[in-house]
Amino acid sequence: MWNRRKVLGSCLVLAASSGIARAQAPGMSGMGMPGMGQGPMTRESCIDICIKSHQMCLETARYCFEKGGDHVAPTHLALLLDCAEMCQMTANSLMRRSQQHGAICGACAQLCDACAKDCEAITGDDQMAHCASLCRDCARDCRGMVNMPI
């Protein structure tokens, strides 16, 4: 049975080796968004967009609480929070190279599309437009990861 130190040590080694591999990847810095003519779709780029989408949905939920009105509709807030959690779970599954990543990425893409559509329904608001755009990008990249080996 693994003790806590071995588990934590293994996680640190995995995180460090991932960082080293990312730093040594040729031509990866400043690549821009995948799927935008900036380079190939990678597991790392999907992790990055999922983390960004997670953060954006949480920030947008907070913004909606402060804004009030249509922004605080229970279904809208629930969708933002569901999307944030799904994006975080997807990033986590990709980081640990889960064999179930295809199913998780597919579900994330569907939820991000729904969140983007809901955010776009609140027109004339830059925060909502930015959230919708990032969710669409995340959905696109997650769809691209569904059948990719990791």
Say what each PLM segment does.
Residues M1-A15:
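N-terminal secretory signal peptides and thylakoid transit peptides that target proteins
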Residues W2, Q24, E120-I150:
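Long terminal segments
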Residues R4, G32-P40, M56-E66, C83-T90:
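Short charge-dense sequence patches
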Residues A21-L58:
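C-terminal segment of N-terminal export signals and the immediately downstream linker at the start
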Residues M28-M36, C83, G106-C108, M145-M148:
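Intrinsic low-complexity, intrinsically disordered segments enriched in polar/basic residues
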Residues I49, A61-F65, D70-T75, L79-C112, ...:
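Extended, low-complexity, charged alpha-helical tracts
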